[in-house]
């Protein structure tokens, strides 16, 4: 990208090298750690290829929560001269956007299935998959739909900071898309190469599993945060989460009526501060009644996005939670997903807190620490 003007903000050195690497590989992985600016690198690389006429349209596939807050925002920042559209909403609306003249079209994973035929017929010659671990299983409908819209000459860049983080076999589905010759034809053969059976239901990684996975997931570039010396101390990203139907119902009701009835209990909002606090409680998943009882709400959308963040991180995750009962709800849900979790709230003694923080900093577990904001 030596002759490139780098529109928008000035890139960091690792972003320049990442963008250059992507432009040199029709199919490639970007494994830069979370918070290193992978999105900007991919946008600049795409814009460069568009300038050269090597690609005509770009399809960005990413989580629903970052379609607007990350990708559309970053495209306006780093490629403001390009036409951008988000394919979300009804099937007809998505189809119209796919057929539009937008140079960048952003769509979520499951949205691809809705308009897969339209995408396959269109002229998307570069596909960028953000948080690519969602395509680790080659048997899923999601994986098969992505494979369907790819042509032999399609550019494909798959990005994630946590490749094969759960198991070496996770590399198979990713490699089959980018580097199919780097893995066996069948999953079972690959599994035998990277794992060995301990018992009927237990498999463990072989000693050479890391090397096998490394060779399969090529060509690839990776920068860790400590290698990116010019990064700011803190990097902020936003994610959008829709309220669940249950939350939305009572959120609107409380806004309109100022008094909400849930399961026979009255929850009063006698002033603006209390009103706002109740709305925040609904959003967080647990509302306190006037009698002190906690009433739980469906927070599957909120939890899904939190789980995405945890899965995408190669480091431990500290989560600040505004309300005590919401912490318990999150801890129980994380536990069901086998994610080791510790809690810091008002019921935890100072001595116990010290032990929890020490474990979080030095031990493999817990992976997640949930803390009340005012406690921390």
Predicted regions and their residues:
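Conserved Helicase C-terminal RecA-like lobe
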Residues: 2, 9, 23-24, 35-37, ...
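Loop/turn-to-beta-strand initiation segments
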Residues: 101-104, 125, 154-157, 365-368
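Conserved pre-motif I regulatory segment
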Residues: 1-31
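Conserved P-loop NTPase motor "coupling/switch" region that bridges the ATPase
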Residues: 81-84, 126, 134, 143-228
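Conserved helix/coil segment N-terminal to the catalytic DExD/H
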Residues: 91-104, 109-123
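Catalytic acidic motif of RecA-like/P-loop NTPases
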Residues: 35, 110, 133-136, 163
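Conserved helix-turn-beta segment of the N-terminal RecA-like "Helicase ATP-binding" lobe
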Residues: 67-89
């Amino acid at each position: 990208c030596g002759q490139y003007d780098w529109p928008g903000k000035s890139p960091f050195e690792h972003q320049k090298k990442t963008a250059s690497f992507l432009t040199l590989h029709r199919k490639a992985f970007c494994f830069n750690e979370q918070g290193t600016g992978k999105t900007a690198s991919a946008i600049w690389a795409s814009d460069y290829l568009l300038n050269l006429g090597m690609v005509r349209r770009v399809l960005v596939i990413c989580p629903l929560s970052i379609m607007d807050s990350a990708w559309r925002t970053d495209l306006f920042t780093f490629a403001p001269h390009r036409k951008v559209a988000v394919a979300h909403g009804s099937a007809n609306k998505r189809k119209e956007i796919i057929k539009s003249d937008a140079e960048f079209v952003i769509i979520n994973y499951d949205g691809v299935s809705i308009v897969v035929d339209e995408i396959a017929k269109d002229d998307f010659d570069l596909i960028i998959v953000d948080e690519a671990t969602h395509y680790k299983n080659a048997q899923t409908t999601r994986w098969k739909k992505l494979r369907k819209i790819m042509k032999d000459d399609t550019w494909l860049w798959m990005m994630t900071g946590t490749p094969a983080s759960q198991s070496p076999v996770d590399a198979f589905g990713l490699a089959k898309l980018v580097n199919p010759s780097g893995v066996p034809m069948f999953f079972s053969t690959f599994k035998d190469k990277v794992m060995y059976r301990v018992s009927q239901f237990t498999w463990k990684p072989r000693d050479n599993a890391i090397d096998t996975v490394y060779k399969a997931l090529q060509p690839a570039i990776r920068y860790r945060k400590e290698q990116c010396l010019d990064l700011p101390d803190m990097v902020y990203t936003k994610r959008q989460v829709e309220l669940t139907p249950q939350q939305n119902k009572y959120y609107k009701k409380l806004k309109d009526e100022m008094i909400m009835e849930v399961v026979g209990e009255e929850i009063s909002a006698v002033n603006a501060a209390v009103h706002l606090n109740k709305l925040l409680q609904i959003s967080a998943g647990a509302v306190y009644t006037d009698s002190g009882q906690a009433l739980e709400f469906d927070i599957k959308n909120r939890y899904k996005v939190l789980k995405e963040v945890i899965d995408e991180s190669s480091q431990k995750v500290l989560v600040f939670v505004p309300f005590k009962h919401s912490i318990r709800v999150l801890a129980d849900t994380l536990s069901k997903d086998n994610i080791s979790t510790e809690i810091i709230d008002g019921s935890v003694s100072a001595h116990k807190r010290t032990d929890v923080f020490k474990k979080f900093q030095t031990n493999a577990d817990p992976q997640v620490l949930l803390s009340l904001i005012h406690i921390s």
